[in-house]
Amino acid sequence: MKKSAWGLVDAFFDKYDLVDHHIHSYNDFVSNRIQEIIDTSEPIELEQGQYTVETGKVTIEKPFIKEADGSKSKIYPTEARLRNLTYSAHMSLEMRLLKEGGSETEFEKVHIGELPVMLKSEICHLHGLGRDELIEKGEDPADLGGYFIVNASERSIVTMEEIAPNKIILERIGEEDEKRARAIVTSIRSGFRARISLEYRKPRKTGVFLRISFPYVPGELPLVILLRALGLATDQEIITSISDDFNYQMIAADDIQVSLDKLKLDSDKMEEEMDEEERREYLIRSAIKYIGNRVAKGMTEDYRIKRAEDVIDRYLLPHIGTEPDKRLEKAVYLAEMTEMLLQVISGERKPHDKDHYTNKRLRVSGDLMEDLFRVAFTSLTRDMSYRLERSLARGKEPSVKQAVRSDVLSENLKHAIATGNWVGGRAGVSQLLDRTSYMGTLSHMRRVVSPLSRSQPHFEARDLHPTQFGKICPNETPESPNCGLVKNLALMAKISEGSDPDEIEEVIKKMGVIN
């Protein structure tokens, strides 16, 4: 290699560290995402006394330790290792208790818990220190950070490889001669993940071709019934929204006929007693009632309808929105998804390659800590609400400071990082840092793990894919069942950051590209 090329490599590593993706992601989590989680969490309302707890700004201090004599002093990572401590930061949140009809009170700072600190992040005492200063603090100046110290153990959060969220993935299923295909979307909003699966298969007897499943609805629903519930009331609206192609329209028409029988409509009443608008409302309400019978069987009709609407709004394609006015937008999205699925069945469109790196996303420390903090903060607010309710029931004056148990949040965060058992039932998300050698440590910090089961073959997922070139190391993967499922980032690979689609849309609107 020419001297100039080595100079380029040196310049790259002078600017970018091998663990930058972890540190930058964690910094974003601390600076922005914690406050966003608190701001968007459900309000804390008490049943008794009509009280509401209002939250304000969160404050995160750099790590310190309180000694037995009450004095406070900075704590550095080396001391945490030697004294069997967790290297963590003190978190305070502005809170106030508001009573309906009462005067507003001032915010008070309440200690809500301890946040494990990533070494070399912005809230770490080692951030920005030079070589001599690091040596003075008992640290290896060549250590890049990017890991945690929990109960004196060094723990690293591994990068998780997942299917791209909020994107339609088309695949063929079953035998090659079977006309079966599926469209899947992993819809994500505010930490909630909803897997929506739309499947085409030939009905055994008098069933439908197109079936859809999504969270909190037992079994599968006929697609056209769901489209009606979302606002595409008439047969014509459903058919034209799915496709302009006559063959695809005929498949939809067959499903419409079967679904009408399932809805048990009063045809005479529709023809004789209703105008066009009333017929639309009747069809939409009948479809919602059908879904309600699935999600709240045996309950009153009003409750079934309310529950069905709640499930549709909150758990069907939440990335589009969770408000009732987003239903029609969801219907259009599902109709487009249906046409793509039918094109796969007819051979007009190729199914997606799930192993193509366009269809993958990497979740690093900040993303995984965000999931963990959201669940931990929800546990804290529930516990606080319970304690406040109990105080009111005993006739005591409620106090936010006394109601908050900081160990609820602290233990949730610490336990997950210490054991690797994450929210959502995932295991092995954090691991004991490999200190066999310096190269082993760097390798561990750039590890990428697939969530697929090690006991299954998954031949295609384990194979080296051409789109991994320059992103994933083609050589570094372990033998044993982990082969091909545990990978490493290429030496000069960088992980780009996702952007908020709402912000992008706003910029495009300002440029006059879309109305």
From Swiss-Prot:
Q: Name one Pfam family in it.
A: RNA_pol_Rpb2_3
- Alphabetically list the UniProt keywords: Cytoplasm, DNA-binding, DNA-directed RNA polymerase, Nucleotidyltransferase, Transcription, Transferase
Which cellular component, as a GO term, is one annotated location? DNA-directed RNA polymerase complex
SUPFAM superfamilies under this entry?
beta and beta-prime subunits of DNA dependent RNA-polymerase (SSF64484)
Question: Which InterPro entries does the record match to this protein?
Answer: DNA-dir_RNA_pol_su2, RNA_pol_bsu_protrusion, RNA_pol_Rpb2_2, RNA_pol_Rpb2_2_sf, RNA_pol_Rpb2_3
Does the record's keyword annotation contain Cytoplasm? yes
| Source organism, top-level taxon | Archaea
Catalysed transformations (reactions): RNA(n) + a ribonucleoside 5'-triphosphate = RNA(n+1) + diphosphate
Its BP terms in the Gene Ontology are: DNA-templated transcription
Q: What is its EC number?
A: 2.7.7.6
As for subcellular location, the record says: Cytoplasm
- Per UniProt, what is one GO molecular function of this protein? DNA-directed RNA polymerase activity
Description of how the protein assembles with itself and partners: Part of the RNA polymerase complex.
> Its family?
Belongs to the RNA polymerase beta chain family.
**Job of this protein:** DNA-dependent RNA polymerase (RNAP) catalyzes the transcription of DNA into RNA using the four ribonucleoside triphosphates as substrates. The Rpo2 subunit (Rpo2N and Rpo2C in this organism) is implicated in DNA promoter recognition and in nucleotide binding.
Show the PANTHER family listed in the entry: DNA-DIRECTED RNA POLYMERASE I SUBUNIT 2
What protein does this entry describe?
Answer: DNA-directed RNA polymerase subunit Rpo2N
List the taxonomic lineage. Archaea, Methanobacteriati, Methanobacteriota, Methanomada group, Methanobacteria
